[in-house]
UniProtKB/Swiss-Prot annotation:
Component of the ribosome, a large ribonucleoprotein complex responsible for the synthesis of proteins in the cell. The small ribosomal subunit (SSU) binds messenger RNAs (mRNAs) and translates the encoded message by selecting cognate aminoacyl-transfer RNA (tRNA) molecules. The large subunit (LSU) contains the ribosomal catalytic site termed the peptidyl transferase center (PTC), which catalyzes the formation of peptide bonds, thereby polymerizing the amino acids delivered by tRNAs into a polypeptide chain. Residues 73-106 are annotated as: Disordered. Gene3D superfamilies: 1.10.10.1410. The modification N-acetylserine is found at S2. Component of the large ribosomal subunit (LSU). Mature yeast ribosomes consist of a small (40S) and a large (60S) subunit. The 40S small subunit contains 1 molecule of ribosomal RNA (18S rRNA) and 33 different proteins (encoded by 57 genes). The large 60S subunit contains 3 rRNA molecules (25S, 5.8S and 5S rRNA) and 46 different proteins (encoded by 81 genes). The 5 acidic ribosomal P-proteins form the stalk structure of the 60S subunit. They are organized as a pentameric complex in which uL10/P0 interacts with 2 heterodimers, P1A-P2B and P1B-P2A. The 4 small acidic ribosomal P-proteins from yeast can be classified into two couples of similar but not identical sequences. Each couple (P1A/P1B and P2A/P2B) is distinctly related to one of the two acidic ribosomal P-proteins P1/P2 present in multicellular organisms. This is Large ribosomal subunit protein P1A. Pfam families: Ribosomal_60s. Residues 81-100 have a biased composition (Acidic residues). GO terms for biological process: cytoplasmic translation; translational elongation. It comes from Saccharomyces cerevisiae (strain ATCC 204508 / S288c) (Baker's yeast). The keyword DNA repair does not apply. PANTHER family: 60S ACIDIC RIBOSOMAL PROTEIN P1, LARGE RIBOSOMAL SUBUNIT PROTEIN P1. Keywords: Acetylation, Cytoplasm, Phosphoprotein, Ribonucleoprotein, Ribosomal protein.
């Protein structure tokens, strides 16, 4: 098990038990699990997590940026919509015809 993983799990155990996260407590847990961790790594993790509520971080995470919204207003005529569709089809054909010679099996 890597040092980072062991310290992360130890921090989660402490947070779940509602115990303050400190470098000594992180080292105690990792030593109990027979995972060798240098003191500096425990200090870094303890300082990074100081004042953080891990339960809130785990529960209230964001999955990333929202997808862009579609066009709200539609085109008022059928001809304009057809022209745009044809234009998109032409662009797709042009892109597919571009052979730069970088094929996988060339």
């Amino acid at each position: 098990m890597s040092t980072e993983s062991a310290l992360s799990y130890a921090a989660l155990i402490l947070a779940d038990s509602e115990i303050e996260i400190s470098s000594e407590k992180l080292l105690t847990l990792t030593n109990a699990a027979n995972v060798p961790v240098e003191n500096i790594w425990a200090d870094i993790f303890a300082k990074a997590l100081d004042g953080q509520n891990l339960k809130d971080l785990l529960v209230n995470f964001s999955a990333g940026a929202a997808a862009p919204a579609g066009v709200a207003g539609g085109v008022a005529g059928g001809e304009a919509g057809e022209a745009e569709a044809e234009k998109e089809e032409e662009e797709a054909k042009e892109e597919s015809d571009d052979d730069m010679g970088f094929g996988l099996f060339d």
